[in-house]
């Protein structure tokens, strides 16, 4: 594949949706791009309990190198594993909970901003976290792939518990509303807010910052270029990200002539 940020992306996956006839699902996925490189193994038992609770686990290894973007220079390598549970509370609503352990190794450079270098000097180049997550989602759109009406909402909370090195909380909420105009035309209004902060005397890890700009947040800007900036020692202006974000936008979708449902 190809994206404006990642450029050429190579990906491969092996998925079994009915593992050994049990109804369980297992997926091995590998992605490699200019910024993100990930290998992940996931397992899901959608019928873990008679009450409709699903259970799954994930193991992953992820490398992040945002130096090709206009983002402050650093690299990170993460390895982790976690367990998750999901429960449908209504026809269109679902809640989920999870607990995972993560170890992230960070590399900073002479051109990295002072807060990044200070973070590594204070906490070391390896950060370990025991992360608890909770989320809620509601999808009342008329189509998952080609929506023209309905509402999509999601909220999530992520807390690095005081068991290991990092201690932070991160929350986000997104709301999308689709208005149909007939003939496949639709107006989509989107709002997205997020807030994060360290606690118990610990800083928010800079690699947990929010960014804005680019497809998926604010079109017309390069990826992750909005927000606080700094000029590095080489004279390049780069984005720092921040602990809060608020985005509101509107998008108009219409069928491409001769493209069927493509918009």
What are these regions (language model features)?
Residues 27, 147, 167, 183-186, ...:
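Short, surface-exposed helix-loop/turn micro-motifs enriched in polar/charged residues
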Residues 44-47, 173-174, 203-206:
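Charged/polar, low-hydrophobicity segments characteristic of intrinsically disordered regions
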Residues 77-86, 153-161, 167-199:
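Transmembrane beta-barrel strand/turn architecture of Gram-negative outer membrane proteins
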Residues 89-92, 96, 143, 162-163, ...:
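Short secondary-structure junctions and interdomain/linker hinges
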Residues 186-263:
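Extracytoplasmic gating/loop element in the C-terminal half of outer-membrane beta-barrel translocons
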Residues 1-152, 187-189, 216-238, 243:
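Gram-negative/organellar outer-membrane beta-barrel architecture
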Residues 44, 139-143, 160-162, 176-180, ...:
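Short beta-turn/strand-loop junction motif enriched in small, turn-promoting residues
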């Amino acid at each position: 594949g190809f994206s404006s940020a990642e450029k050429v992306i190579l990906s491969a996956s092996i998925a079994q949706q009915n593992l050994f006839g049990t109804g369980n699902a297992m997926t091995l996925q590998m992605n490699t791009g200019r910024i993100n490189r990930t290998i992940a193994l996931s397992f899901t038992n959608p019928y873990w309990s008679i009450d409709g609770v699903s259970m799954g686990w994930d193991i992953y290894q992820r490398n992040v190198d945002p130096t090709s973007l206009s983002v402050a220079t650093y690299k990170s390598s993460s390895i982790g594993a976690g367990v998750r549970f999901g429960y449908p509370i209504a026809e269109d609503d679902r809640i989920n909970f999870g607990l995972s352990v993560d170890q992230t190794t960070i590399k900073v450079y002479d051109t990295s901003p002072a807060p990044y270098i200070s973070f590594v000097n204070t906490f070391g180049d390896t950060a370990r976290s025991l992360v608890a997550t909770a989320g809620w989602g509601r999808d009342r759109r008329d189509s998952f792939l080609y929506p023209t009406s309905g509402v999509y909402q999601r909220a999530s909370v992520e807390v690095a518990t005081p068991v290991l090195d990092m201690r932070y909380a991160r929350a986000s909420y997104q709301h999308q509303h689709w208005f149909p105009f007939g003939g496949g035309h639709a107006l989509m209004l989107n709002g997205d807010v997020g807030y994060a902060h360290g606690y118990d005397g610990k800083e928010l890890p800079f690699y947990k910052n929010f960014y804005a700009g680019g497809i998926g947040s604010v079109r017309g800007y390069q990826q992750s270029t909005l927000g606080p900036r700094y000029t590095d020692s080489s004279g390049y202006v780069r984005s720092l990200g921040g602990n809060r974000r608020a985005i509101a936008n509107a998008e108009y979708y219409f069928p491409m002539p001769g493209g069927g449902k493509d918009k």
